[in-house]
Amino acid sequence: MAKDGPRIIVKMESSAGTGFYYTTTKNRRNTQAKLELKKYDPVAKKHVVFREKKV
């Protein structure tokens, strides 16, 4: 059974088009907009922007 609460699981997908992704949680009350973080993509072997997608 899923937990009720403000935190939801989101998928951070690489903008490099490699298909690599991270999963993380975000507080939907505090962060209404989609997340954009610069993280390391091991497939592309460099830091790229990861954007939030639906799980």
Curated annotation (Swiss-Prot):
One of its GO terms (biological process) is translation. It comes from Deinococcus radiodurans (strain ATCC 13939 / DSM 20539 / JCM 16871 / CCUG 27074 / LMG 4051 / NBRC 15346 / NCIMB 9279 / VKM B-1422 / R1). The keyword DNA damage does not apply. It comes from the Bacteria. The keyword Transmembrane helix does not apply. This is Large ribosomal subunit protein bL33. InterPro entries: Ribosomal_bL33, Ribosomal_bL33_CS, Ribosomal_bL33_sf, Ribosomal_zn-bd. GO terms for molecular function: rRNA binding; structural constituent of ribosome; tRNA binding. Transmembrane segments: none annotated. Belongs to the bacterial ribosomal protein bL33 family. PANTHER family: 54S RIBOSOMAL PROTEIN L39, MITOCHONDRIAL, LARGE RIBOSOMAL SUBUNIT PROTEIN BL33M. Keywords: Ribonucleoprotein, Ribosomal protein, RNA-binding, rRNA-binding, tRNA-binding. Binds the 23S rRNA and the E site tRNA. One of its GO terms (cellular component) is cytosolic large ribosomal subunit. Part of the 50S ribosomal subunit. Contacts protein L35. It holds the Pfam family Ribosomal_L33. HAMAP family: Ribosomal_bL33.
